[in-house]
Amino acid sequence: MIPQDRHRTRCHAHLDARTCEGRDPWGLTVFGPDRLRETSVPLLDWLAGTGASKVAVHFDVDTVDSDEVVLGLGTVPGGLTRAQVHRVIDDLGQHSDVVGLTVAEFIPRDVLALQGMLRGLPLIGS
């Protein structure tokens, strides 16, 4: 089990600001998107303070600003841009050994819509 002070989460833009800054109900350190838009320094400073040298990144795609692209289950405006997410994860890799990367909640909406449209057509079937 990894101690709570060695976890970090990036908050969704739509969550209550009190939840997004400081600590969430589980005691995890959290950063809202506004703290990471311009720089990864707050996250890197926190990481340095933990003493951890290895990092596992769990990337929820709905943290990406839905005004730029909708990758997740719903639309969540105000998140980080794709470039900002890339920078944050790359910066983590420059300052630690990234040993894991998961991508979560990706919904291939276009593929699902196309499958539904084609279902039952000749040569496709059910």
Q: Which ranges hold each PLM region?
A:
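Low-complexity basic/metal-binding stretches
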Residues: 5-24
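Catalytic cores of soluble, metal-dependent hydrolases
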Residues: 20-126
